[in-house]
Amino acid sequence: MAAAAAAVAGAGRGGGGGADPGQERSRARSWVGAERSEGRRMEPNEELEEEDSPGGREDGFTAEHLAAEAMAADMDPWLVFDARTTPATELDAWLAKYPPSQVTRYGDPGSPNSEPVGWIAAYGQGYTPNSGDVQGLQAAWEALQTSGRPITPGTLRQLAITHHVLSGKWLIHLAPGFKLDHAWAGIARAVVEGRLQVAKVSPRAKEGGRQVICVYTDDFTDRLGVLEADSAIRAAGIKCLLTYKPDVYTYLGIYRANRWHLCPTLYESRFQLGGNARGSRVLDRANNVELT
């Protein structure tokens, strides 16, 4: 497994290689008995159908505004549990110390962090960052916009393939509180145990609003891999609506309410109680076709 963009890694496959969470920002905090700085980066966060700003606000903001806030979050320090360098036995203590509903985006004397935190993330043992040729992708995107040629989902897919920017992520949106913290703990454990490879969650915004958990896969064109990640997420106890977004949209700053009227999410997954064995129904949104 390998590959991806500002993302995480091959979810559900248990192999090495993987997306590059937000293209590995410049600073992060990793748990190795105590916090320490470590270079790395991931990706912005998302709303019910696309991405919200990491600040937590969802409505009335342009795609440009959301992209700017996402970039700011990527550049701030992250809280990271890295299973490649930290014993799995320390995970529970880390989760208890940094529940996402209490970690604040800009720091607060009463929260676990006194300084800004862009994201909280978990890296699996097989995680190897690989974001592809993001600079080449962005240059090709600029050229496409000035060429006057149509900009369609197919165009973006081909750009992503050409520049090997193939990662994507399942998005889980929850209000701050017990359900969010419980869901994040389940996802983080799945990462550390090797059932998923990389995930991150946004900190709590001053304005409130939902927070987002992003669970990454290596290749958005690999439908089987995307569905395997959905199954692993459901097995971790997640029952809410999931949506899936390729990182090419994030790298190019394409969020909801964008000027091209593109929908950045490819799939949605709905939990099915007592339904099929995999526990969810996944819809291909572009073609309105059920995949499971």
From Swiss-Prot:
Q: Where is the composition biased (Gly residues)?
A: 11-20
- Extract the InterPro entries matched here: Bles03, TIF_eIF4e-like
Q: Which domain of life is it from?
A: Eukaryota
Q: Where is the composition biased (Low complexity)?
A: 1-10
| Comp. bias intervals (Basic and acidic residues) | 35-44
Q: Where is this region: Disordered?
A: 1-60
Q: Which SUPFAM superfamilies match?
A: eIF4e-like
What's this protein's family per the entry? Answer: Belongs to the UPF0696 family.
Report what the protein is called: UPF0696 protein C11orf68 homolog
